[in-house]
Amino acid sequence: FPPGQVCCSQMHVNSGYVEDALPVVRNHVRTFMKADYDLAVAPSASCVASLGHQQPDVARSGGDEGLARDAEVVASRTLELSQLLTDVLGVTDAGAQLGSWFPHTVTYHPSCHGMRLLRLGSRQEDLLRTVADIDLRPLPDAEECCGFGGTFSLKNPDVSAHRGGEDREGCLLYT
């Protein structure tokens, strides 16, 4: 991790605190612009999506076009983990190529940001399918919101609990 790395600012922006997000974006972008790396990899599709979809806009709203351009550079060099594994490293069989083994029954719910903003497609599920001894069961309505992402569950706890309950019931039925 580069020294000085901080939050991507997504929580600030999604909560409506765009002005408060500007110094966070500035610190994040400057930290990564001066770091020596070819690619940054994050396990969170939400954070990666924030870099390309929110940080340049936050910089522009603060009147800093140079920061917006730098944010776009940082975003172009940042990948979600499954993008690194499949697109860069060419992993197509996690069991054979990575020695991944998990003798359990699981289901998979794709993240909204991965599915909608990063358009990861089936990368993550395809990788899971190749883990040795895994029993991957389909999750009905997997493309629907889980109701728990980001600050949604904090702002809308009743809706989130209801959606989460539906997802848990679906997971239990199919695994």
Residue ranges of predicted features:
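Iron-sulfur cluster-binding electron-transfer modules in prokaryotic oxidoreductases
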Residues: 1-173
